Amino acid sequence: MNDKLQTTNYKLKIAWLYPELMSTYGDRGNIIVLQKIAEDNGIEAEIVRINQTSNSELLTSCNLIFMGGAQDLQQEIVNKDLLENKGSILKKMIDEETPGLYICGAFQFLGNYYKDAYGTKIKGLGVFDMYTESYKNKPRLIGNCVISPTKPYREAASTAYTLNAKPFLVGFENHGGRTFLSDKSQAFATVEKGYGNNGEDKTEGIHYKNSIGTYLHGPILPSNPELAVYLLQLAYEKK
């Protein structure tokens, strides 16, 4: 895969969920890259900013979804809005294979639950079959990360960068929560360097239908533009 999309000219709507609250570690750079690559390929890309006051139906008009990470307070605000308002629509779109990229806290929201270091359990949307827990006696997982994506992404990914003859992606992780997948075969990638979902089982992220959840900041798409191409191609094919 290169930076060229196999498309004809068309319009694309990219949903940016909670841009004021969920954009830590430069995650807005992912939106910039998606829009730039789309426009370089003759695609008119409209960024649709979705926040707490947005009509939930606005989300359904979009072809691609992005949500970044946040600090704990901002995550509480967003999680409340998702559970009470937009979550059912988001879940339906993901289940119906609308492509999406969900970073760190956004990735955690889509699991079954998040348990903080004090034992408080926060309900998730239950889109991804996984859970996340934080522990008082365990450190945050911080540092550069190198991952080898698993199928189905690997077959479509660029082979321009290799590590031990495997395609790989790079990014930066910084998370206190440790995520455990019910089915490890759904992992987005295998960790080559760093911690990944939990620092134990070498899984990183999740690949569910056309959605990718990951702990990789960087931001991830400027560091790995072939992933942006992959998501945009999925959006075109789904449209």
What does each of the following model-derived ranges do?
Residues C62, E97-T98, I122-K123, L169, ...:
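Short coil/turn connectors at secondary-structure junctions
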Residues L64-G68, L101, Y215:
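Structural motif
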Residues N198-Y236:
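A glycine-centered loop/beta-turn motif at secondary-structure junctions
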Residues D72-P149:
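Cysteine-nucleophile active-site neighborhood
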